[in-house]
Amino acid sequence: MRLSKTTSFIVWILLLPGLAVLSSCSTKKNTLVRRAYHNLTAHYNVYWNGMDNLRQGVKESQAELKDNYAMVLPVFNYGDKTSATKLSQYADIGIKKASKTINKHSMVFNRKEYCKWIDDAYLLIGKSYFYKQDYPMARRTFEFVIKTYNQSEIKYDAMLWQARSNIQIGDFNRAEPMLDMLQSKIRKGDAPARYETELNLVYAQFYILQKDYAGAVPFLNRALELKPSSAMRTRCKFILAQIHQLNGETDEASRLYTEVIKHAKS
């Protein structure tokens, strides 16, 4: 059974007295009680503190960003260095919380990690560096996740973020094989289909930042078929309208612009 966030928080509060007693639990012994304690506290350190903090920072940053409508929009707008500087205070907390989670709660026995949130903590560190626009550190972190947790689905998240990092610094030769590999795994059923929406959006970003707008079109259309968020659907339609307009396909451009306007009014 999946608990709601509110219910989970209540459970967490009720468990606090017992956790205070367990707070001295060592990560050196592999027992059920120690695993339960470190998994529970790691979960809330990562998601309720670090991850939620980063999400809040990204949300505030996105609200302040301005798009340049004189150009074909990117799928993802991460802002400039000024935006990254403002976001850094949130990203730094994400890095701090995730690092604390790893240092205090990692339980490795016979080369197996028994705290299931450690890989998420590393991914959070990578995302935090990404939003700080420290792409070299982000790439190193995502590469570590891909290699270290290659038997876990989280490697697919890391592959997408690794590709995003390479795209942002213009290293398209490294981004493309990563995207192609994940696409192949999804088509073969080796990777979950839930990654396909984001994969198509990142592919579109890959082509748009190279000004290969024709290359982006099929990925934007496929992303729309997969029904991303409402805001992303509107953005994809607007980008497609811009591309059709550039190509002189005024009827299709007009149709898409009309859909965007209707959505904005609703």
Q: Across the structure, where does each feature detected by a protein language model lie?
A:
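Acidic, polar-rich low-complexity tracts and alpha-helical solenoid repeat scaffolds
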Residues: L3-T6, I13, V21, C25-S266
